[in-house]
Amino acid sequence: MTVVGTRPEIIRLSRVIAKLDTHTDHVLVHTGQNYDYELNEIFFEDLGIRKPDHFLNAAGDSGAETMGNVISTVDKLLVEVQPEALLVLGDTNSCSSIIPAKRRHIPTFHMEAGNRCFDMRVPEEIIRKIVDHTADINMPYSDIARSYLIREGLSPDMIVKTGSPITEVLEHYKARIDASNVLAELGLKEGQYFLVSTHREENIEPDVAFGRLVTLLNTLSEADGLPVIVSTHPRTQKRIDAAGVKFNDQVRLIKPLSFSDYNKLQLCARAVLSDSGTITEESSILNFPALNLREQHERPEGMEEASVMMVGLNVERVMQGLEILVHQPRGVERSLRQVGDYSMPNVSDKVLRIILSYTDYVNRVVWKKY
């Protein structure tokens, strides 16, 4: 059984889901954490992923309520389905599904384990620690993430590094990305716009941070007179509407795009500004100029290769960063090395084999079933 609930999970697990569907009696579950069409269903269609076998409608009015709903609804489903193993990815509320599986002695596997930003104000940091320390088998992307898990006392024999799945995903859908007509549809020219994506609670909810974001977007649109395309997460749009924000004409708010269209925009933008956790990986793999709109991160391996610059919402730092990025060679003309742990071509094969290899191991060693 694989449990998903948000767009990043669906994207990163797309090839793993296909592999598990081919080789196992696979059950796909969507918790409904972010069941907005633009955020979820459009990605199932664009990535050619089948619809989930179960949709749990677990979204609550708060993070705590959502986690509680996920735990209780998944627990009931586990009784019904009786899966041999459970797989989750990342650090979302949907990953709390690992708790009832653990309680029922079902082997649990966690992809993207070991990420740490060392800032407990970040909600995902809390979930990471809970899930990492609950999972039977942790599958980090990098050597650094693996070292964090060992430092926290987790057994090395229950940690298997896989590398990031995103290279395999991007390669599989490359033709679709190349064929995207999104620039023409939006009336954009290559290299003549900025692309922005921001949705994190710490950038949207506090008044001070949100005010800085609004100032940044307006300043960016005035600096070069270029369109600023903002892929607007529902949380961000809700905050904008509630605050009655007025943006400059060049700031264009658009609904979340398909995977193919969004990556086409990233490849062709003058620069991408994002607070997404995936920006470090995508900018390293695809080699486009990128700024991380955060004050902390959980991917030091990306910083070691300078694949992205971390600037927060500081307008001066953003402008300074953009001046540097304009000189960055793009595409195959690299000046920055691709992060080694982001270049794995066969992560879906690894994950399939790890699950099949360790399910019986966990039953025997952890649960003493035989």
Where are these regions (language model features)?
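Short alpha-helical donor nucleotide-sugar binding micro-motif in glycosyltransferases
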Residues: 74, 78, 264-269
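A nucleotide-sugar donor-handling region in carbohydrate enzymes
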Residues: 33-38, 57, 134-209, 311, ...
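A donor-sugar binding/catalytic signature common to diverse glycosyltransferases
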Residues: 88-89, 95-98, 110-111, 138, ...
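Active-site and donor-binding regions of nucleotide-sugar-utilizing enzymes
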Residues: 1-4, 9-16, 43, 55-153
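Donor-nucleotide binding loops and adjacent catalytic segments primarily
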Residues: 33-36, 41-43, 178-268, 369
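Conserved nucleotide-sugar phosphate-binding/catalytic loop shared by glycosyltransferases and other
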Residues: 25-66
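C-terminal amphipathic helix plus adjacent low-complexity
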Residues: 327-370
